[in-house]
Every structure is written in C-alpha cells, then in structure tokens.
Amino acid sequence: MNQEVMNLFNPQAPAQTFDSIRISIASPEKILSWSYGEIKKPETINYRTFKPERDGLFCARIFGPIKDYECLCGKYKRMKYKGIICEKCGVEVTLSRVRRERMGHIELAAPVAHIWFLKSLPSRIGTLLDMTLKDIERILYFENYIVTEPGLTSLKEHQLLSEEEYMIAVDEFGEDQFTALIGAEAIYELLASMELEKIAADLRVDLAETTSDLKQKKLMKRLKIVENFLESGNRPEWMIMKIVPVIPPDLRPLVPLDGGRFATSDLNDLYRRVINRNNRLKRLIELRAPGIIIRNEKRMLQEAVDALFDNGRRGRVITGANKRPLKSLSDMLKGKQGRFRQNLLGKRVDYSGRSVIVTGPELKLHQCGLPKKMALELFKPFIYARLDAKGYSSTVKQAKKLVEKERPEVWDILDEVIREHPVLLNRAPTLHRLGIQAFEPTLIEGKAIQLHPLVCTAFNADFDGDQMAVHVPLSLEAQLEARVLMMSTNNILHPANGAPIIVPSQDMVLGLYYLSIVAEKEPGEGMIFADMGELQHALENKVVTLHTKIKGRFKTVDAEGNPVLKIYDTTPGRMIMGELLPKNVNVPFDICNQEMTKKNISKMIDHVYRHCGQKETVIFCDRIMQLGFAHACRAGISFGKDDMVIPESKAKIVAETEALTTEYEQQYNDGLITQGEKYNKVVDAWGKATDKITEEMMARLKAVEFDPVTGRQKQMNSVYMMSHSGARGSVNQMRQLGGMRGLMAKPSGEIIETPIISNFKEGLTVNEYFNSTHGARKGLADTALKTANSGYLTRRLVDVAQDAIISEVDCGAEIGLTMQPIVDAGQIVASIGQRVLGRTALDPILHPVTGEVIVEAGRMIEEKDVEIIEKAGIQSIRIRSALTCETRNGVCAKCYGRDLARGTPVNQGEAVGVIAAQSIGEPGTQLTMRTFHLGGTAQVVDSSYLEASYEGTVKLRNRNVVRNSDGNLVVMGRNMAVLILDATGKERAVHRVTYGSRLFVDEGDTVKRGQRIAEWDPYTRPIMTEVEGYVEFEDLVDGLSVSETADESTGITKRVVIDWRSTPRGSDLKPAMVIKDKAGKILKLSKGGDARFLLSVESILSVEPGAHVKAGDVIARLPMESAKTKDITGGLPRVAELFEARRPKDHAIIAEIDGTVRFGRDYKNKRRIIIEPNDDTIEPVEYLIPKGKPFHLQDGDVIEKGEYILDGNPAPHDILAIKGVEALASYLVNEIQEVYRLQGVLINDKHIEVIVRQMLQKVEITESGDTGYIPGDHVDRIELEEINERLIEEGKKPGSGNPVLLGITKASLQTPSFISAASFQETTRVLTEAAVAGKMDTLQGLKENVIVGRLIPAGTGGMTNQIRRIATARDELIIDERRKTSGSAEANAMLVDMTNNAAE
C-alpha cells in the first residue's frame, strides 16, 4: 500500500523505446555533458563519520545523496523538499539510486592516449598515423621527440629525435625554426592536424598504382580506418583523452566490514592512483619543476590511466595490497565473469528451488511430484493472494503467519493454487532444449522431486543422486508458453533426428522383451483363444505361459472405425501388449507381434505417433511403461556369475594365434618382414582371435537348450536377454566378462602387441592388470578434459547460428543440393530415404520405370514417399537446403523442411540455428563422457579387402589392369572403380579400388553378395612397374640416399631409402628405379613418359639391380602408419577442426584444372609439378610438393579437376575454390557425420547445413566496381547481391566477389551485431573496432535482444515484436491524419500518450 502511495508522488518515466544502439568514441565535450562534477581529491569516505568526502570519489554533492530524500548534513529530510539543493552541503534532495547513474570526471593536467586504441591489435593510432607501435610508444613514454613542423631545416616531417639529437638540432637551427613535440601532446597534435578526406583520396590513388601485394594490404588497412573515421563522424584526436570519466559510485562500492575494515572495488584503487598522479602533476607544473620530473610524472599518469582502462595490457600488472592484479574496466566486461556473460546473458532466477530426484513410475507423463515443503515456498505469493481473497487474512503479514504455522487451510489453498499451474524442471548441464521441460506438479510427502521415468533420456538423468531445479512461471503468458510449448507431452520427438525420445529404457525394455519371447514346447501350445478374457483365464490357471505359441483373435478397426477381427499366430505375452495399442487402421497387431528390442519399441512408438497423433501416443507410452515395469519385476531376470559363459574353444583359438605370432616373429627374424609389418600383423591376428572368441561366446549364450526331463525350453540366458533387448550392456562388455579382454591401447593411442587373454570372470594376471590400467586411466582423464572442450564447441556453434531464424515461408530459390546414399566400404550407411525424409523436393521426383511423379517440386517428402523412392531404387534426388536458401535475414521454411521435433513443416519464428547448434553440440558432450566405457580396449580399424554388397554384373570404370608374374590381375590406375550393376543396368554400388590392389573379377563377371572382389595390403603402399624389363637403380647411393639397416634383433638387412637432402653431397640426387630392356635402353610407359619410378623417403626396396620384372610386379613398398585406435578423441577435435575450417596439418593438394602432369625443375627441397591444361586458354598451374612425401603420380598422367595430387585431408577452402559450394557442403556434412556415426549418434544433415550456411555468408570482394567497397573486404553475400541489383538499375558497374569460408569463431566475430560479437570473445578488440567505425547494432539476433532485456525475435517473441511494429505503424498513420485535420499540439500529446501506453 505504502509503495503505491509513493508511486503516485514519484511517477516512473516510461522506458525509452529504441530500435538500435550505436557505439562511438566519446569526445571530451560528451564526457563533460555526462558528468555532474569534477573529482579533485582521491579521498573516499571519512574514517570517523563514514560520510563521503567532498570532491572525493564518493562525493555526495556530485553523485547524489546516500539516503533517500535526505541531504548529507541532515538539514533537509523527507519528500517535501524533493529537488532542493542544500545550501550547506550542496547535495540535491532526491532518491539515493541516482548514485547508480550519475557520473563524474577528472580533468587531466596532460593528455593521455587511450590504451585500447593504442595497444589493441592492430593499433588504430598506429595505422592512422602510419607509424609503428614501437615508435608511438617511444613518443608517448617520453623517449623520443617527433618533428611536427620541420620549417626550413634539414629535418623531415614525422622524424624521431632522441633527447641528444633534439638538443643538437636546437643548438644548430634554433628553437623557433622547427617544432618537435614529445609525449601524448605530440600524438594529439598529429591526430588533430590530419585531413582525413585528403588522406583517403591519396590512399585510393596509391592503391590503384601499387603492384606489390604486401603494400596493397597495408594501404587497404589504413584506408579502411580512415573511412571508418569519416563515416562515423569520430575525430582521430578523441583517441587521446584530456578528460577521464568516472563511473557512478554505486557501481564501484565501498562496503564496511565488521572489525572496522572496508571491502572496496578495485576501480577505486585505480581511480585513486590517477587522481593522485594528476594532482601531483598539476602541482609540479605550478611549481615550474624541471622538465625531467614533469615528464616522469606525465609518464606515470599515462600508466595509471592505462591500468584503469586495461590493467596488464602494457607493462607490469598493477597489483593491490594482496599481490592480486587489480580488475580494470576492461576486465569488468571480459570473460565468463564479465558483465556480458555473467549479468546480461546469465541472470539469477527467483521463485526456484532444487532437490534430489527420485523415480515416479506411477506418474502420468505430464506430471512431476513436488514435495509439499517446496511447493509451499515456491507458490507463496499465490497463496497469500488466495488467503486474502478468501478472507482468511486481511494483510500480507497475517497471511505470512498462517503460512509459517502451516495451518490446514493453507494446504487446501496450496492444492487449489497448484492445480493446472505448470512448473519448469531443469537438469544441469542443459545441453539441448529438452533439458528444460514443463510438468504439472502433484504434491507429495518427502523432500525429493519425483520424475517420470520416460523423460530421463531427454534430461540425461538417472537416480544415483542427480539434482534438478524447479522454476515457477509467474505471468499468464509464461504459464501459457510452458503448457503449450514446453510440456513434456509435447516433446516426444528428438529435435536432432526426429526419432522418439520418450522411449522405454532399461527395466521397461527388459520387461517388454520378456513378454514378447516365443518359447518351444511350452504347455498349451497350439491353443486358440477368442478374446483376451479367455486368455487371462488360461494364464491365471497356468494352462498356458506368457511364451506359449498360440493362435489368438485380435480386435482392431478398419478405416471407417468398424471393429475387425483377425486371427494371428502369436503368444499370450504379445497379446497383452497388443491390447494397449491404440485402435487404428494404420496400427496393425504385427507391429508388436515380434521380439520387442529397444529398436523395435522405438519404431512402434514412432509409428503410433505418426498415425494416431500426440494424445494417443502419450497414453500409449504411459501404459507401455507400466507394463514393462510390471513384467520386468515378474520375470525376475537377474545377473549371476554363471550367466557369463566362457567358450570351450577359447584355449584352442588362443593357442593358434600364439603359434601365428611366433611365426611372424620368426619371419621378422629371418628378415622377410619389417618391424612395422610384424607389429601390424600381430595386432591384426589378435584382433581376429578376439572377434572369433566373441562370436563363439555369443553363439553359446544364444543357444536354445531343452530340459531333458520335461522337454520344455530352458530359460534364455539372462545376460544375453539384457544385452540383446538393448536394456543394458553391449557385446563388447560381455566379451570382456566372458571372452577375452583383447588388445589394449597405450596412452598415446598405439596398441600394445600383447593382448589381455584373460577375461574378468577368470581374473587378470598381474602383468595383464598393469597393461589394462593405461586405458582405464586415460578414459577417466579424457572425460574430464573433453567435457570442457565439447561445451566450448557448443558455445561457438550457438554463437555463430543464433540469428538463423525461420523468417519467411518460401524464398523461391531455384538451387539446392543433390542427395545420394552414403556408402562406406561398400556398405550403405545412410540410405537415400533417410537423407531426404522431411526435406522439400527441388525438382519433381519421377519413378525411373513408370515415369510417374512420386513427389512434385516444392512438396515435402514424407514417410510414404520415402518407401516408394527406396523401392524404385532412385539413386540421387535434388532437394532444397538451408545452405542455398536466399532469404535475407534467416532461412525460409521451404528450404528447411520438416521441424524434426514436431514432425510437421517448420513454423515461422523457429530458431533453427540454435536447435542445430544444440543438436550437434549435445552428443559431443555425450560422446566425450562415454569414452571410458570401453575400458580402453582397442578397436583395430583397417580393412584389407572388398566384398560385393549386391548381386550383379561387374563393370570397371577407368579400367587399367595388368597380370603380374603370379598371374593375378593388379590395379594400375589411380582412380579406378568397380561398379556393380543390377539386371536393369542400374548402378547398385560403386567401390573405389586403390592402386596395387589384386582383383578377383574382371569386366562382365557376375558376383554374388559377399563375394570377394579385391584385396590389398593395408599396411604398405606398393610401387609397381607397368612394363616388363630389367631393373636399374638411379641415384641410390649407399649411405647417402639408401641405407642397409640391419634389424637389431635379427641381424637381417633391408634396403631403405633415407632422407638424402640432409647432407650437402646428396642434395641433387633423385633416387629412382628405371626399367630397361635387354639392350639397356629405358622403356617407355603407355602414357609416353620414361619408365622411371621416383622413390620417396622410407620406401623399402623389394628387388635387386638387374632383376627381371613383369608388369604389375612390386618393386618397392612404402610402409603406412601403424593402426591407431579410433575413439571420439579423434572425433571431437576433428569436428571442431571442420567447423573452424582449419587447414589440416598435412593437407591434400587438389588439382585446380583438368590436364596432364609434367615434372618441372625442382626447387630447393620441393618437387615442382606442373599441370598442363587440356584447354589452351588457361595458364598451366604449378605446385610445389615437399620431396619425401609419398607421391604417386608419374610424368604424363592425366588428371581431372578436383583429383588429389598429394593425399591427405583436403583443406575445405580448396574444395570451395575448386569444386564450389555444393561439393564443400557435401564434404563437410559427410566428414562430420562420419565422426558421429562411428559413435552411433544420429544427427540430421540439415543441422550441419544450417551451421555451414552461417560459415558461408561472406564474399571477398575481387572487383569493387561502383560498390564503394575495397578489394579484399568481406561483405555479406546477399547484401552484395542487393547492391549490385541497384547499381545495374542505375547503369553503374556492379562489384564481384568469391565466396569465403569462415570458421565458426571467425564468423561469430564478424556478425553485423557488435553486441553479440563482444559478448562472445575478444571483447576489447570487438568494442574498439566498433567504436572506431561508429557501428550501429540493429538488434536483429537473439543475443543482442537478451542483453538489452527484450523478448527475443524468435518464437512467440517474434510474433509479439511483429504485432508491436504493426501497432506503431497504425498509430503513426492515425497521428498523421490528426495532424492534417487538427493542430500539431494535439497530435503530439497523443503521441506521448501512446508512447506511455506502449511502455506500460
């Protein structure tokens, strides 16, 4: 009540409405206009009275009163004197909170450079003056003079003079003949005297004339800054400060602690230093002190101001009393604890609580159990209001008492208040939007929150002590959003891949699986049941068991809703489950008449959701959960020692493998294979042995046994049931328990040759245990490190994609991407159907045989279409993609396609960028947290053969094969592929075969599925001859380019090419083998070059000089890297590397044109390769390749654009430049997907495409035309297109540019919004740049709006903003009408009125 009366006297000014925020450099006049007075003394408060000192840092006269409506001396108190200035102490009588907004200033006795513009790279002052930072610092810190006006002397303008040189010049020319200044005054003069228009014109002329790249870059940088100053209206001399602003005292408080000490903000210390030094300098100047003393004081003042703005940027960090660096103004903004991230983007929430969670299996999906104590505390305001309304209390105080005493009527009211008032539950870490969901609370006893088991997957929660936070949505709008958008019943599908996320797991799966098992020879086999009643009766009387094979009549409905009866071969367990299925024509009994593994249950729920809608699905899920729990409990499936079966054949397999390894050891001792080859073979052999033992073990576990007495089937192995159903445990874990643990990895990632032969059931020997500790510990260490890495990746992704919002329905783009199935090692890992589901077709999709239209252009591809597409065997489809979308701000709904979390076309306003970022980032954390589940056991990944994945006829593309001396077909081509065609001649599979592979089929052969097509040695790469003849060595000089290395352990020698460039004598050698005929003439290759084979470092020679070789024989081998284990460790950094668009370390070199390979003159230790184009209009392209890199092209080879000259991972920038956007997109999508696929994580392609779109938004200007840009500028792609359209209309010359790929960090920092960029990273740099350019932030993205405290322009906030815009436009129209009819005074009054309404 009192507050309301106060508000009458103290009306709040309506909040300003604004559409944009501008940042620029403050001029001295501006700083003075903010200030309420000058601070002259360094004192803070009086130590006895605790009142602020006059003219000090907390002065009440300048900043306002300490107590509301009370002057400092106490003469004026109370509201009635509001606005009076006390004549005794000079304090205005007003609210004390003005101390949070009133600023002061310090007038400096000498100008000081602003450290941000000086030291933040690139130095703005340096670039503008075209001087190096070192020189400027020399002037600023009083080491050198600078000549500003040489007059008629021999000195040059801007020449630096040391103290001595200055003295000599003064003696020589006289003091008034020239002007040389020192310190910040000098820089001030230089900046003030700059004529920016003239400089800009000169720079443009220079730019046009210069040819050197380096100079051009430098001129462009300078021109850019000059233009920034011209456009923004900033003056260069404002970068030198004569007045320092002082921030309001309540933002740098001084708090008395008990014991008479004070806690103070570091800023006060820093300000104190500035004031002290400034006052001392003033006094010294008044006293006319010697120049050297004044200079020293000026330098100290400069350092003090530097420390205030950015402590530690230059020189030593200034520390406080406790040796801790003081936090300067910059540090207040920077980093996780800075203003942006701590207070503006992350705020504390009232009306919230947290507690431990326990499982609530009897809850409905939309409910959660809330402890009464918590509910009472959280809903207090609502309870008070209700008590008041019902007349139980007349004041808040009374209501408070009632609630504190917990009177019975309070509990009744709590029940009323809580009814249908959703609360939000959140579990940290909130990695995706399903980490916060709304539930309806039900009151429970106890102190733990109850959580529905089905939502655990979404929260990634378990009940081993996890805690969750509860938040209460207060306003009606918030409650509405919570219910309609965030209710757990609305989040059935996973936003990352569109699969159900409300899926039973663990016990529930086990129970349902147990229900669906079929057993042989059970009692009552073959009985027929008419309905569920009969069946229940039979079950209760043990006539049949849950697993008996029976015939049952099942009741469903047809399309009209009439009941239909049908008889199925099934089991009673499955009938019980079928009872729960929603009655719908599209949900047949067959869907649960199968083994219910976790996969099948997920499919069933998905099917129900697609055909019966959300409500039915939710009811079905709840029922199926209860059924699962009940039967898991009934079944009593447990885990016993004897459930882990060790296969009898284990000893035999181990003995065989040990014999093999001994044989390899012998071969190595005889010198037939190298150390590396032996290692690879041993590791391979043990890997195969482990797999074999695992297979035998699984076969034993799976085996069905019968009881000899009753003849009934024995109970299945319970551990096998757990694993096979998907409830818990994997084959890998079972292998370690009952098979053999297998190979282990060292912390470096290499595999240890000796495996762990024991399993956990037998127990490990001491040595084995020691070997296994590596992996286990590395797993734990990795987990801790990677969680942070993955979180950082998510943060960068969110930042780059935050402004990708669905902003229109259709952009009308006529370009898109081509989708094809992804084939890996002959296996289809992602079918075309999976990839195009939920996307919009770009062109009509036609049936290849009948030619009828399956999907029209512009229609979304649904599940039913996918079935037809898969059956028809269509191999490539053009679809629309966010990547090629032409919407200006955001993405259009057509290009995006289906909203995966809803299963419908995406709505306008959906923040697809953030969803994409969360979908990619969330599993990153999952994966990293899951590295150690393998217990460090190694997985060897290397294939050495190729099997047909389909039946069909073989066709060889780019056929190039020869028969070698063993009579095998050997592949000689670099880009040869084996195609398998079906009966209609359609390609069913394409397999690339590597150079040197042995082929078992030839053109026209027919193959069966699983037949071997080719094999190769995965550990070495062969160098083969194409012609028959005699070998001769060239430049293979012992000790220089070739060394006989004797193996330490065997004494056998092998000849290896060594790095010949390390000695001066060998620098000109080109080690090679030549094939000659009998007469000693060098033979020619088919392509016309000589038969000379250049050898790289580490090649092992396989033939002796003079040996006779046939085509296809191996003359040398190059060892490959030994097999490393694959783990997401390679994964997360790999994903980050791809998103950051970094050039890989040894990146591939890609041919830019089609042509013929020629070898040029070598350059130092690089090999020069020239591609002569087939088209004479193009220039030849040169590449320099380090010698000693394994390089497989020969002189005269024909090469296609985009082929690899040097193997390795390609740099994404090269793909973009050479093959274009679509190839880049498919490369990035496939590479990133491969990492996730390896871990079994499904992410829809469109999420990755959205991020890649954000990385490809800029073009680099190559031809500026009349656009006003400078070549080399990065400009928004769509912005450039718009400017060009306008220029063409006006008949001017348009500009052109090449698309550039920016890494996600770079792209985030280059957003048009400086607020968003500053809150992301490198805050000082972003703000400095923005201030110089006088940037305007139009508040388009999400972050900017959160920071200024508005609704975000996405989702419901986007609609609200739109409505507000429409309303404002309407108001303006009405006012215009009024203006025309009546006077302007009335219209203005109306405008004020409307503004106030809007503000309220």
From Swiss-Prot:
It comes from Brucella abortus (strain 2308). Mg(2+) binds at residues 462, 464, 466. It holds the Pfam family RNA_pol_Rpb1_5. Belongs to the RNA polymerase beta' chain family. It catalyses: RNA(n) + a ribonucleoside 5'-triphosphate = RNA(n+1) + diphosphate. The gene is rpoC. PANTHER family: DNA-DIRECTED RNA POLYMERASE, DNA-DIRECTED RNA POLYMERASE SUBUNIT BETA. GO terms for molecular function: DNA binding; DNA-directed RNA polymerase activity; magnesium ion binding; zinc ion binding. GO terms for cellular component: DNA-directed RNA polymerase complex. This is DNA-directed RNA polymerase subunit beta'.
